[in-house]
């Protein structure tokens, strides 16, 4: 799945967007920024969380940190990161390549307002060596994401 499912997602929904593949690892914000030649804040990281019985994905700017209190208020429960052993089974993507595109099964997706500081962001594309360049609004539109304010930007 993963890279292939993301390529299929874009072929169907946005054929004008190219999936970029790097020979360098893009498994972390810092590595992705280096691999794709952008500042770390432009990397759109996808957080895989369990809140109560629900699994949700929150996409945020690379320099943003999840605010547990805001997440608890918004979603009605304490957020817990999915375990490393759960991520691929639930999302279809390996850790370091998790993104809101080409998921194994539909999940609620939320885009944090921290992304709106940028005209173009660079989320992963299903593997630890791939990404796409996309506007935050287009990403939200393609994934049917809801905009939320649940992160704080590091200064």
What is each PLM-predicted segment?
Residues 1-155:
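Extended, low-hydrophobicity, polar/charged segments
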């Amino acid at each position: 799945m993963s890279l292939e499912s993301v390529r299929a997602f874009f072929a169907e929904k946005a054929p004008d967007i190219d999936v970029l593949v790097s020979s360098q690892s893009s498994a972390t914000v810092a590595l992705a920024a280096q691999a794709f030649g952008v500042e770390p804040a432009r990397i759109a990281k996808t957080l895989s969380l369990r809140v109560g019985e629900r699994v949700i994905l929150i996409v945020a700017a690379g320099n943003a940190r999840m605010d547990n209190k805001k997440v608890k208020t918004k979603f009605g429960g304490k957020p817990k990161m999915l375990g490393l052993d759960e991520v691929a089974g639930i999302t279809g993507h390996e850790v370091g390549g998790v993104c809101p595109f080409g998921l194994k099964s539909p999940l609620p997706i939320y885009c944090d307002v921290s992304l709106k500081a940028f005209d173009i962001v660079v989320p992963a594309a299903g593997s630890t060596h791939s990404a796409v360049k996309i506007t935050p609004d287009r990403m939200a539109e393609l994934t049917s994401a809801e905009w939320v304010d649940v992160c704080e930007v590091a200064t």
